Amino acid sequence: GFVHLSSGDMFRNLDPQSELGSVFLEYSTKGELVPDDLTIRLWRHHMAQMANSGQFSIEKDVLFLDGIPRSREQAERLADNIDVLLLLHLKADQEAMVERIHGRALQENRLDDANPDIVRRRFQEYTAETAPVLDYYPASKIRTIDAGAAPLEVLRQIIEVLQVMLFPE
């Protein structure tokens, strides 16, 4: 089977009154990334919960990570836990993405994405922290997707890449 794990959803589902939830709110409202130690700790805890509840089987399931690793350090620290088969790099014009993310925030009541200035700051964080992750993995494992296209076209591109990887002819 296939299991999708979004680090953003993982953080947004935290109780804002909990230690990790309040830390996430502190960073996300400023457009900053949660420190690697806390992110990895939460990821490992979440994965253990999924495995213990039967939602994920390391022997049977393919895990789609969304939003993690967010830094080269996270990639290095996760290397012992995951075997990366493929990395989808969704690339688009920054201002178009700011508008899209802002619109989604309003529709889905996602406060961490509601302020366009905060979203722009996250793009700066991406350039500084996340873009180097692309250099960590071999180029042969990276596929770039035009995320500036219409959402259905983006989905089509992703499905096409996954079909080639999962069901080679």
What do these predicted regions represent?
Residues G1-F2, N81-L86, P138-I142:
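Short glycine-/polar-rich loops that comprise or flank the Walker A/P-loop
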Residues M10-R12, P69-E73, A92-V98, A150-P151:
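Conserved nucleotide-binding/hydrolysis micro-motifs of P-loop NTPases
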Residues H46-S53, N81, R104-Q107, E129, ...:
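Conserved, well-folded catalytic cores of nucleic-acid-processing
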Residues V3-R77, Q107:
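ATP-dependent small-molecule kinase phosphotransfer cores
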Residues L65-I68, L90, P116, F123, ...:
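Conserved phosphate/pyrophosphate-binding and hydrolysis machinery centered on Walker-type P-loop NTPases
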